[in-house]
């Protein structure tokens, strides 16, 4: 069976068993700061297992894309050198959230693996492990499934602590945990290795193909296991591993998925396909790089972007080892899309973007790779011992962009190692320098803990009423706030929008008899809305009912800008491509700021096109439609979701212009697109690697911006004695006239310099038979002094010249030495001395050099150095 057929068979099997087929989640974990990348099928269901989230189903099956590179789970250094390590892999999984448990999970696994309708694996080739004390699982395998005791192994606490075992899974030191049972495939006696638990278990004969985790306990801080009321199941089977078994090969790189990628890699590099480790590295890395880029990661020097950069650069370096000339890595994307694009349509949609990002990164690395390798060669030539010091590793990282694992790769090939601890010390020193130069603010929301939810009334209007359910002062819960005190008010319901999704929080006031609380900002802590402000009059206490009034004009102006960001997002994807994804936004009453993924500056004509598209949608005055629906229905309708944003089962879908813009959004918006009035882009630029930013204004602010531009145009027309209609012609004529005058001025300067040269040549002095000329000429720039030195060299025939002067409040210096003297006297050496004397720097060729400085008071002393320089040099 081909890998694609195995994937589909697995998902279909569990659908027949009542499971809901759930799409793979993004490689960027949603709202989980503990994870760098999605690395297991259960990641997207974590809150379901913790009981924090309810879904419409209790059984699920997925084929989850996973990356293990960087962070706790890092397979990068082993990739290419072993049969089964990858940076990217697919994890097939079936999950039960308080539904079925051990018996069904084990029976399902055995049926899928051994039934002639499904994988039809020989039963005698399968071995099973269970946790040492999990008699229930053992009995199911032995008595119900019929696995003989000689092919079953109990695995105890083999990692040095209670419940620390290959067959006991835990989410952390406390929380859900439980035993697991693993299924192994025996590749046969011709391959070295022993069964799990034996001294030879690290061999390749017995390979784990499926792990079934039974979450049946909650571990408390005292280490005691308490049974969970609704035990769950989490399973995982690596697609690449089971494909190797079914395709009768012992290495994942021999399966159909990799055979095509290896061939494409060899073709792009221009080398033979002979199973080289470097070729495997390239074939593996094109998968992780392409999927990461498709999910919105771009190469950078921090976080996920840096891991991506490391993987790309490692692939490029291994391609170069195989003889690649020029950019090759991006050329393999097409083969990957052909292989996996049907199962993961985001690859097809983003193909052009993936290729562009990889090509740009490869070209950027090529500029420093050769130079960095030369530096490394020089350092290795003088190396004492077999360890590359941490400071050298850091220098290659910091100056030449060599990730530490790339240097480690090179070291491995020479039977060397790297001082990773020394490298980390250098990195920490750099981080400390960065911390010292930064200032950090406090997140006051983090101080406020509220075990309550606030109902939002703001979609219907800006007025409402609510009851105070909590008060905070300086982060501590209080029963009341007095007049003049600052604090936080939490209501059971409110019309105030709390800052989220890039939209700022509302301001306004809360009021009751004899009391007024001025709300300066509104934020969120969990489901609670926090009204930050000050008691302007009277006092307030928990339990009081208040009138809540958000500032309507600010809310409306903010709504214009928020709705405009949706139109802009859709227009960007239309003009630039589907690779555009929102990376951040800020929406307030004055303007909008929208950050998005794109690898180059937007051309002026594209900016105009964006404005035209958005304003056309505004003029259509179409209704802005909102709908509450489940997340899967919303996605099926094409609703765009923000990467990294976590959504519940029920979401709010916002549509503008029919299907022109369909996004998931909880913000406040206009009723019709025509309410926006006008859209005008005010700036565009880069904010990070692969991220661009557009700032714009709408409505009255856009009109004010255009009026100001009109006034500037009128003022410019007045200055050139023209009108609005001919100001460009007038300016063009003025610029041309200015160019002519500058040309004439240069000619006059040349004549003046020639005349000055005739006069200066006669002032040269003779030192040890050499003519030396040093002179001060204020008011001439470096270009004029260069021309004059050239002229004087011709007039003197043989000699040393140093000219200097003050131009634009800075010292300008030029030195010249005739060709016959450059063996002993070099203009660059003279310039370094003279420039240093005036507090500056300089240098150049033996016959001509330039420099400058800031201390005009020392200029005469600097010029006097010419004579000393000649006397000492001859």
Curated annotation (Swiss-Prot):
Just give the chief location class. Answer: cytoplasm
Q: For this UniProt entry, which residues form the secretion signal?
A: none
Nucleotide-binding as a keyword? yes
What cofactor does this protein call for?
A: Zn(2+)
Entry-linked SMART domains: tRNA_SAD
**GO MF annotations, alphabetized:** alanine-tRNA ligase activity; aminoacyl-tRNA deacylase activity; ATP binding; tRNA binding; zinc ion binding
Cellular component GO terms held in the UniProt record: cytosol
State one Pfam family annotation: DHHA1
Q: Which UniProt keywords apply?
A: Aminoacyl-tRNA synthetase, ATP-binding, Cytoplasm, Ligase, Metal-binding, Nucleotide-binding, Protein biosynthesis, RNA-binding, tRNA-binding, Zinc
Q: Which reaction does it catalyse?
A: tRNA(Ala) + L-alanine + ATP = L-alanyl-tRNA(Ala) + AMP + diphosphate
At the top of the EC hierarchy, this enzyme's class is ligase
Cofactor binding summary note:
Binds 1 zinc ion per subunit.
Q: Which residues bind Zn(2+)?
A: 562, 566, 665, 669
- CDD domains linked: AlaRS_core (cd00673)
Q: Which domain of life is it from?
A: Bacteria
Q: Where in the cell is it found?
A: Cytoplasm
The UniProt family comment states:
Belongs to the class-II aminoacyl-tRNA synthetase family.
| Protein's job | Catalyzes the attachment of alanine to tRNA(Ala) in a two-step reaction: alanine is first activated by ATP to form Ala-AMP and then transferred to the acceptor end of tRNA(Ala). Also edits incorrectly charged Ser-tRNA(Ala) and Gly-tRNA(Ala) via its editing domain.
Cite the domain annotation text: Consists of three domains; the N-terminal catalytic domain, the editing domain and the C-terminal C-Ala domain. The editing domain removes incorrectly charged amino acids, while the C-Ala domain, along with tRNA(Ala), serves as a bridge to cooperatively bring together the editing and aminoacylation centers thus stimulating deacylation of misacylated tRNAs.
Q: What is this protein called?
A: Alanine--tRNA ligase
**Can you name the source organism?**
Ectopseudomonas mendocina (strain ymp) (Pseudomonas mendocina)
């Amino acid at each position: 069976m081909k890998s694609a057929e195995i994937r589909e068979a697995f998902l279909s099997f569990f659908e027949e068993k009542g499971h809901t087929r759930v799409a793979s989640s993004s490689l960027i974990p949603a709202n989980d700061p503990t994870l760098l990348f999605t690395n297991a099928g259960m990641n997207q269901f974590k809150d379901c297992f913790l009981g924090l989230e309810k879904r419409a189903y209790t059984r699920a099956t997925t084929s989850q894309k996973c990356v293990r590179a960087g962070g706790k789970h890092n397979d990068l250094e082993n990739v290419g050198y072993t049969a089964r390590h990858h940076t990217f892999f697919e994890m097939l999984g079936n999950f039960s959230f308080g539904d079925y448990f051990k018996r069904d999970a084990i029976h399902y696994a055995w049926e899928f693996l051994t039934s002639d309708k499904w994988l039809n694996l020989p039963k005698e080739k399968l071995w099973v492990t269970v946790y040492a004390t999990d008699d229930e699982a053992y009995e199911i395998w032995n008595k119900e499934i019929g696995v003989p005791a000689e092919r079953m192994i109990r695995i105890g606490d083999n990692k040095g602590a209670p419940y620390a075992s290959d067959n006991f899974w835990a989410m952390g030191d406390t929380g859900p945990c439980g035993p697991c049972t693993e299924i192994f495939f025996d590749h046969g006696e011709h391959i070295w290795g022993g069964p799990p638990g034996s001294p030879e278990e690290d061999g390749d004969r017995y390979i784990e193909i499926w792990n079934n985790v039974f979450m049946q306990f909650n571990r408390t801080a005292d280490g005691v296991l308490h049974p969970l009321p609704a035990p769950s199941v989490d399973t995982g089977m690596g697609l690449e591993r089971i494909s190797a078994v079914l395709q009768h090969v012992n290495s994942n790189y021999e399966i159909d998925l990799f055979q095509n990628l290896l061939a494409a890699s060899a073709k792009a590099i221009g080398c033979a396909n002979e199973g080289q480790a470097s070729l495997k590295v390239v074939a593996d890395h094109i998968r992780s790089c392409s999927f990461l880029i498709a999910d919105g990661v771009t190469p950078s020097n921090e976080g996920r972007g840096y891991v991506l950069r490391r993987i790309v650069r490692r692939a490029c370096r291994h391609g170069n080892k195989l003889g690649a000339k020029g950019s090759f890595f991006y050329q393999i994307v097409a083969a990957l899309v052909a292989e996996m694009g049907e199962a993961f349509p985001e690859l097809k949609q983003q193909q052009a973007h993936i290729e562009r990002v990889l090509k740009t990164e490869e070209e950027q690395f090529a500029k420093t790779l050769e130079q960095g390798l030369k530096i490394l060669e020089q350092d290795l030539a003088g190396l004492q011992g077999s360890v590359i010091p941490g400071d050298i590793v850091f220098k290659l990282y910091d100056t030449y962009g060599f990730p530490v694992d790339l240097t480690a790769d090179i070291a491995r090939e020479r039977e060397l190692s790297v001082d990773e601890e020394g490298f980390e010390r250098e990195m920490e020193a750099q981080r400390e320098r960065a911390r010292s130069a930064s200032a950090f603010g406090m997140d006051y929301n983090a101080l406020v803990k509220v075990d309550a939810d606030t109902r939002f009334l703001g979609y219907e209007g800006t007025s409402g009423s609510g009851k105070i359910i909590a008060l905070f002062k300086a982060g501590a819960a209080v029963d009341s706030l007095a007049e003049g005190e600052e604090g936080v008010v939490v209501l059971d319901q409110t019309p105030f929008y709390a800052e989220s999704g890039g939209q700022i929080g509302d301001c306004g006031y809360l009021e009751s008899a004899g009391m007024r609380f001025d709300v300066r900002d509104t934020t969120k802590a969990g489901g609670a809305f926090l009204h930050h402000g000050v008691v302007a009059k009277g006092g307030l206490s928990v339990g009081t009912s208040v009138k809540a009034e958000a500032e309507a004009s600010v809310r409306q102006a903010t709504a214009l800008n928020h709705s405009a960001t949706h139109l802009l997002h859709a227009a960007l994807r239309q003009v630039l491509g589907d690779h555009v994804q929102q990376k951040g936004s800020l929406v307030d009453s004055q303007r909008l700021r929208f950050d998005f993924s794109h690898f180059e500056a937007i051309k002026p004509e594209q900016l105009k096109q964006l404005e035209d598209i958005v304003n056309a949608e505004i003029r259509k005055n179409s209704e802005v439609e909102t709908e509450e629906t489940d997340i899967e229905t919303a996605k099926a309708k094409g609703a765009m979701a923000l990467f990294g944003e976590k959504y519940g089962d029920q979401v709010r879908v916002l549509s503008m212009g029919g299907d022109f813009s369909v996004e998931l959004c909880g913000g406040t918006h206009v009723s019709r697109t025509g309410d926006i009035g006008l859209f005008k882009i005010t700036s565009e630029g880069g904010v990070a690697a692969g991220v661009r930013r557009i700032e714009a204004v709408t409505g009255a602010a856009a009109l004010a911006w255009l009026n100001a531009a009109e006034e500037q145009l009128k003022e410019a027309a007045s200055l050139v004695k023209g009108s609005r209609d001919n100001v460009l012609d007038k300016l063009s004529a003025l610029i041309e006239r200015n160019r002519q005058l500058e040309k004439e001025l240069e000619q006059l300067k040349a004549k003046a310099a020639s005349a000055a040269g005739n006069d200066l040549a006669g002032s040269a002095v003779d030192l040890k038979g050499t003519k030396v000329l040093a002179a001060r000429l204020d008011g001439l720039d470096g270009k004029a002094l260069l021309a004059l030195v050239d002229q004087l060299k011709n007039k003197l025939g043989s000699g040393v010249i140093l000219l200097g002067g003050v131009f634009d409040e800075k010292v300008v210096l030029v030195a010249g030495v005739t060709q016959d003297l450059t063996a002993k006297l070099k203009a660059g050496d003279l310039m370094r001395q003279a420039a240093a004397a005036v507090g500056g720097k300089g240098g150049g060729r033996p016959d001509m050099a330039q420099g400058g400085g800031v201390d005009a008071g020392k200029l005469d002393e600097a010029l006097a150095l010419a004579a000393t320089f000649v006397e000492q040099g001859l």
